């Protein structure tokens, strides 16, 4: 094949050519498929035709891209596409004509639309023929689309422009063209309302009128035309929205009507699209109200007929039988708070499951006594407490049914009303309860806020007396509601029309002159809905009023009033935001937009003439608007009020407009106007004073507050004219204005924390409010008025009480400074408490009665308000009860108060709201109980802690109740106070260290307290930082003889200072000390079960360190700190020997051990100082003596561990400070200074012995029945090591005493072996050194025969017998000790037996056999020495013993020349290096012994058999012979010694990076394996004949041969040396590779 490529040809061109060719083939294939489709279509085989069309349009050239475009275009392709789409459209048309009877109308329409789609697609590729345009024209006629008909006609007429010349000659046109022109004329006539184009005008002027008969449509298209007519008729029908009404009321209509449109945030009403209807998905063309799935008219008529037939009934009965439940939430999403808080019923308000009457009665009888028990228990204690203070109650709390309240009781009527409110609570009651609520809290008020409150009174809606309620809208007859519904349903009104009609009914003036929005009381949902309608339609209604002012001026005035009320709400919220420091920029924007709207309305309404009530409504609304936007100093306000007053006086009408629904618009009557006028004048006076004396603004405000306080309290000190003027103003002011003034005064005293004046004012206003409820004026009101008065008064009581609680609980003090009037105040609080008591009793009644719904479940939000008030009043009741007890000096007043608080807690906790009012009651109870000394408050406190913190102090869980309180976070001041109480209660002056029981209850609390306190910032307190420095300086000091002496004398001192911060008291009380005791006890328990971790000690050390740094001078803390360090050292030394092998790690451990010794010395020092403390009781002195003895013991033991192995006195070493030395040459050098001992060995010995002796002697002065055997045991050991021969005088008596004490301390399962072993060994050593005769030693051993249990003759010794008989008896006793070891942990007797056998009997085999028990030479265990640490073995001594045993065992094996066992030992010791001290020395010794033994036993010479042999070997021959040797290797052909030596040496070489084992391993391989194999096969290998073992003995120099020149490959070799020198050398690695394979077969 030729590789020629033309210069003008590229691969891309080839690809294009191939693609073009492929496209041509596709076109051919398309035409073939198209012809086949036409063939099937002509034969009316529609399924086959459809398949072919589907195949046709799947061909690539007919498929457009995602955008509907085609990649390639050509005349052929355009024609193909036109024909394909055209004929597929025809196919669909023919199919639907043939199957029109079988298809439903939807399928017919779908197919016709496919026809249109394909035909229109065909027109995009080529000009359509007459058949296409004719078919499209018929289809468009069927769809009755004139525009499409006109388009297709114009398309057909303009398709050939040359035919335009023939338009003037009618006879020259073909009939088809004439038909098109006539059709075009007809279409233009039908669409004559549209402008005619220039072309159409020319056609109409040129063509002669020639009426042609209209051809009828085919049946299929005629059916389409019919369907089109049906659709048009259907579209003309209005879409009816059915609105379901739950009841027939304006509220329900408004609520359901508002739900038709999307919910709107309040801010959206000020946007460009304020109407939420604009956001609706579908238009609401027609609204129809329905109720219970039947027309509303029928329902209305039925209810009206029933209403006319029966008598009117009381509102209470209606409320009881069908209460309207509160609904939570607000539609006003743009504001921070809803203007009218409402509530939703909880899930528990669902109808209860029906049960039989018999079951209900039986359940009620059974549970009634149990239900009333909480009230009976509380009442009994309550009466007992009030009786102590000689307060007589006129009512029985245990049975407080409404019918049981005495009619003579002062609060009889308000209590009945309270019960009625609870029973029939509705959203109306919620409105009453929230009427007096104010936004913001006192905590957010700054200085000077009181004066601002004075001026802000003008913007309050609570001006008038009582704000007397008017008739409720729901109480009006149903007639108007029915008429409205009938009008809407009969006229089929649009959404806008219904909304406008509703606004007209509710906002316009009625024929009798009344207006529903101003003269009736609405529910919050109704007013909120109307307000949203007003904000949505404000612009449209403005245009309506502007155009038809006389007709709609009442509606416009109502709109303006609603807008002004909304503006007042925004002003109020802005004020609240300013007080709380919140952001109010959005509210400012809303205010500005709303003011612009109102200004436009005011200008419009100013042009209208109002008469009658409308006139006064307009004047009053302008005044309210002016009041919002102006300051109190604005004269327009006074002028406006004067004008209104003048008009009211001159009016013949009695003007009294309630404005019940306007929260920020006051009632309009003469009394209101005059009150407002006088109030403004007074406020102007205050404001003018502020403006004239700006420099004394604060003082003048305070003077005004003080004057106002004197006036309100009613003091007679009204000397100045200003005071008298203010008094007149206050006396004439309405009640709620006085309440506002009271609030200002109380806020002021709260801000300055003046408890005395606040107390006077609080109880004065509380008395006024209570007397208001008990007055005749209250009883004379209607029930609805009484309920409003009651709930608003309770709300005021709650508000003032919460302020008082805030003042009393400041800094968590809960203290009443002035208790001189506590008894009188307590009586008033009792009256208020009884007034509120139905809140809890009603819940009990609701549980008794199946028809009564729980108030707490029915009205969740409102119940929270009343719960808070009940709890706050309970707190004051407790405080003033304790104050009254103090005032009257009641005996056991604290105990009675404790019971009273606990009873109150059980009462309110039983109803699950003891944590109400931000947990005030729980805070007070906790504060009081923690301040009580004694155990009376412990049980109540446990219940408080369970509720407040979910903190359980143990005990029987069933004895405490779960009140469902939300847990609070434990704060520091509470935590500290709680810890103080519990520490005093739990320990009661006992030392926590000596209490054996684990106070787990206190442990949890202590941990929580410490967690709350957190890590103490020592660096932030200069005293603590100083203490840290001196503390660390002491712990870094060396242990000297002086410091030990000073500790024993109590003369050590550290310059610590008490920081005296907020933690000093609790630390002095023992918080951190107790925590350290508990944590250390827990660590000990975990340590016994091997679960403790050393890291746990870090937190304990930090805890104890905190106690020391606060200078508590508690010697127990130093003692425990020393124990922590001892545990750290013990953990370092017990588990691995790394801390003993690595010098740096051992130095760290020694430093910690030195700290432990210093801590013990300081503990001993402080303990010595406390001995002479006269303030200590005898019990405390005994406790201190007990701890002092333990300090002696641990100090002595720590000194012992530090001095002897494995630490070997390292903690007593100190580094010499670096110094520069001048040498002889004049250079300054820093000499290497080795650490020097800080105390001599003799002093360590004397100190240790002295401390042990002191500890042992202290047992004589104590009453302990069991002494510590370790003290005499260690005393004896120390003396024996130091005194040696002198020890025998009295030393054995000490050992015998230790043995006797150990026997008493032993148990049947665990015998203490150590002192008995010590006795046996000391007797043995004394005899061996000649210090003691065998018979004398046996006498000492006889003293311990109760444990050794030998025959009497065993201890007899004939002087003629040899000493070895005595040694045999020693071995017998040692075996006896091993037998008594139940746990099999002791190993020293076994070692000593082996030692005696070897040293005294020269029995190497016996010694090896004994040591074999301790050694695991050939086991799979990696440890060579298999021993356990006995309980009383000193830390780290285990690794010393291991090293001792290993070295002795190696010595035994060396004496026996057992080099194989030495090799196994060396191999294991490489893996067991961390199990002993000096592991590397022991390993090197074992290796040395093995190598020497192998050399001697196997007669190998490493130089001869390895170093000199390797260079002489032929590489290829070595590999071949070695492979043959490995392949035919058989262990039976070699001795055990050779194979084991080879395996051991290779394994040692593999585990070592050195070359110590190379020679031995290679020598064994070549001498005993390789060379004998070569000698056996050298006869067959001539090339290797000159490599003889004997030639090596001739001192052949391989260097010379290696330097010889290589011979040519074809030249015969002339000498062996030349042959060797020319090949590759055999390396050690090559040899070891072969050896490894041999070793694998051996092992």
UniProtKB/Swiss-Prot annotation:
<feature type="compositionally biased region" description="Basic and acidic residues">
    <location>
        <begin position="361"/>
        <end position="370"/>
    </location>
</feature>
<dbReference type="GO" id="GO:0000122">
    <property type="term" value="P:negative regulation of transcription by RNA polymerase II"/>
</dbReference>
<comment type="similarity">
    <text>Belongs to the HIR3 family.</text>
</comment>
<dbReference type="GO" id="GO:0006368">
    <property type="term" value="P:transcription elongation by RNA polymerase II"/>
</dbReference>
<comment type="function">
    <text>Has a role in a nucleosome assembly pathway that is required for the integrity of heterochromatin and proper chromosome segregation.</text>
</comment>
<feature type="region of interest" description="Disordered">
    <location>
        <begin position="311"/>
        <end position="370"/>
    </location>
</feature>
<dbReference type="GO" id="GO:0003714">
    <property type="term" value="F:transcription corepressor activity"/>
</dbReference>
<dbReference type="GO" id="GO:0005634">
    <property type="term" value="C:nucleus"/>
</dbReference>
<feature type="compositionally biased region" description="Basic and acidic residues">
    <location>
        <begin position="324"/>
        <end position="343"/>
    </location>
</feature>
<dbReference type="GO" id="GO:1905268">
    <property type="term" value="P:negative regulation of chromatin organization"/>
</dbReference>
<protein>
    <recommendedName>
        <fullName>Histone transcription regulator 3 homolog</fullName>
    </recommendedName>
</protein>
<keyword id="KW-0159">Chromosome partition</keyword>
<keyword id="KW-0539">Nucleus</keyword>
<feature type="compositionally biased region" description="Polar residues">
    <location>
        <begin position="345"/>
        <end position="354"/>
    </location>
</feature>
<dbReference type="GO" id="GO:0000082">
    <property type="term" value="P:G1/S transition of mitotic cell cycle"/>
</dbReference>
<keyword id="KW-0805">Transcription regulation</keyword>
<keyword id="KW-0804">Transcription</keyword>
<dbReference type="InterPro" id="IPR033053">
    <property type="entry name" value="Hir3/CABIN1"/>
</dbReference>
<dbReference type="GO" id="GO:0007059">
    <property type="term" value="P:chromosome segregation"/>
</dbReference>
<dbReference type="GO" id="GO:0031491">
    <property type="term" value="F:nucleosome binding"/>
</dbReference>
<dbReference type="GO" id="GO:0000417">
    <property type="term" value="C:HIR complex"/>
</dbReference>
<feature type="region of interest" description="Disordered">
    <location>
        <begin position="1598"/>
        <end position="1629"/>
    </location>
</feature>
<dbReference type="GO" id="GO:0006334">
    <property type="term" value="P:nucleosome assembly"/>
</dbReference>
<dbReference type="GO" id="GO:0003677">
    <property type="term" value="F:DNA binding"/>
</dbReference>
